[in-house]
Amino acid sequence: MAVQQKIRIKLKSYDHSLVDKWALRIIDVVKQTDAIIFGPIPLPTKAHIYTVNRSPHVDKKSREQFSFSSHKRLIEIINPTTRTIDMLMKLELPSGVDVEIKS
């Protein structure tokens, strides 16, 4: 049995619509090269909550909370060709999307 190569692409952003849009665009590019693809797989959303005092030095009970969520998607490509990798490298992702690629 031959060993299969895998590429895992993890997309992260604070805007869920941006992550979904670019995940679909990556899938469209990979489908053109006849590689097997799994995804986009939604990973758990992480909420970040920060609590700060409203006043600079008094009123400890008066606080304000700020929160934001980071959304993640995973795309797995099985048996990528050199054409697949070249097309993925040519994609220009926006600055709001963080991409992590593992092979």
UniProtKB/Swiss-Prot annotation:
Annotated disulfide bonds: none
Gene3D superfamilies: Ribosomal protein S10 domain
Keywords noted in UniProt: Ribonucleoprotein, Ribosomal protein
A GO cellular-component term linked to this record: ribonucleoprotein complex
Any one GO MF annotation of this record: structural constituent of ribosome
Source species, domain of life: Bacteria
Any one of the GO BP annotations: translation
Listed InterPro entries: Ribosomal_uS10, Ribosomal_uS10_CS, Ribosomal_uS10_dom, Ribosomal_uS10_dom_sf
Coiled-coil ranges (or none): none
Its job: Involved in the binding of tRNA to the ribosomes.
Protein family according to the UniProt entry: Belongs to the universal ribosomal protein uS10 family.
Complex formation: Part of the 30S ribosomal subunit.
Protein name: Small ribosomal subunit protein uS10
